[in-house]
Amino acid sequence: MIVLTGHSLTIAEARRVIYDREPVAAALESMEAVRKSRAAVEQAIASGRTIYGVNTGFGKLADVRIDGSDLEQLQINLLRSHACAVGEPFAEEVVRAMLLLRANALLKGYSGIRPVVIERLLAFLNSGIHPIVPQQGSLGASGDLAPLAHLALALVGEGEVMYQGQRMPAIQALSQAGIPPLSLKEKEGLALINGTQAMTAMGVIAYLEAEQLAYDSEWIAALTIEALYGVIDAFDARIHEARGFLEQAEVAERLRRYLDGSQLITRQGERRVQDAYSIRCIPQVHGASLRALRYVKETLEIEMNAATDNPLIFADGAVLSGGNFHGQPVAIAMDLLKIAVAELANMSERRIERLVNPQLSEGLPPFLSPEPGLQSGAMIMQYVAASLVSENKTLAHPASVDSIPSSANQEDHVSMGTTAARHAYLIVQNVRKVLAIELICALQAVEERGIDQLAPSTSQLYHQARRIVPSIVADRVFSRDIEAVDAWLKQQAIRDRLAGGASV
């Protein structure tokens, strides 16, 4: 059971809720803060104060005062009018993350809602009711209005959801689950949609997969190093201590560990003095990506526990309008993730080239073909890797430097954070496929060298991966192999498989 406080949710805990479906509850003390915030809103309404989004219109219509008899209708109108996102729906794990993060943000007690709103979000999460939320349509300020409106509509029994493996009207799922539809009070519609939970949810998913790939890429690279008689001296601890980047030194240490006991690695000057950069500079490049990912994690965990509503309601009764909904911190972090993880594939594709190019492969068969000429072997797999890394370069264009005015120029700078997060996720999927191709090629290459000469660690990787993809003895439809290895890499991290002896 994960207990949400609004202040301490971690990515590790979020993972358990998103993927393992661990139940979630709200901390009692946080719910008390929510009640106090709601009381402050009700007092402000009773006193006749003008409060944005409570008794006014929205965006450029903020100066329009709404009659007291229409305040609840205002909130449902907001959800309906803003639920106009388009495109394919977010995956269920992203929607689960959105539900989790919105509930956690509201538990901070700055949004002026009733506790029942949070209870409904958690009921959806714990019951496995996942609103259908189209991916496109958010500018990332004021938060993720369109996607979150689709999420919130399901709470009131409108829109569609996935429930028990079926797509159905939200009201039908609520009936089957025994959950009454929510009736919105003042401020609650705005509180549900004014936040960055779509981009942050997508960012958490992208980060979790990117982090796994960062570590997996080192294992796969180690196998390639052996296949190419790599020079181990480049990973000497003294080199990396001399520069001072912790992550670079960590990558070098892991490579030394993975390659310990190998009979295929060479020493400086034995076959050549030094390797090409895609081998020699693995610690420097992969380490830089890992360093960037750690910044991304820090940013996401701050945002996961942030109040991103507007206005914010404080315990002393103050109602302050600000801009915490602006997604720029997450947008920049997602753009950084895009660059960091794309670089892993850039390096991997160059190592693939060295495995298949007879001028670079230290005597391996051209394109790792069992019968070069008659059989093309891995030739086109390198093409596919080249295509994917080139696509990544387009996707990695920063979204956060793009802005377009909206709401009659009232919202004249936006973050495009959800676009950044969506593209980050696409890049991660491409990177995994490139690494799958490198692994397939490296497996074939080390067979040519002699698998009895592998290091103990890479030997484990070889034998586990060979259960997924067979040796290349003749040309076949290699897309199936790539898909199988891609799925294998996504299912569980290599380090977890080898450390725990997990079955595939």
UniProtKB/Swiss-Prot annotation:
Transmembrane segments: none annotated. Its EC number is 4.3.1.3. Keywords: Cytoplasm, Histidine metabolism, Lyase. It catalyses: L-histidine = trans-urocanate + NH4(+). The modification 2,3-didehydroalanine (Ser) is found at S142. It holds the Pfam family Lyase_aromatic. It is found in: Cytoplasm. It is an enzyme of class 4 (lyase). It comes from the Bacteria. PROSITE patterns: PAL_HISTIDASE (PS00488). One of its GO terms (biological process) is L-histidine catabolic process to glutamate and formamide. Belongs to the PAL/histidase family. This is Histidine ammonia-lyase. It comes from Geobacillus thermodenitrificans (strain NG80-2).
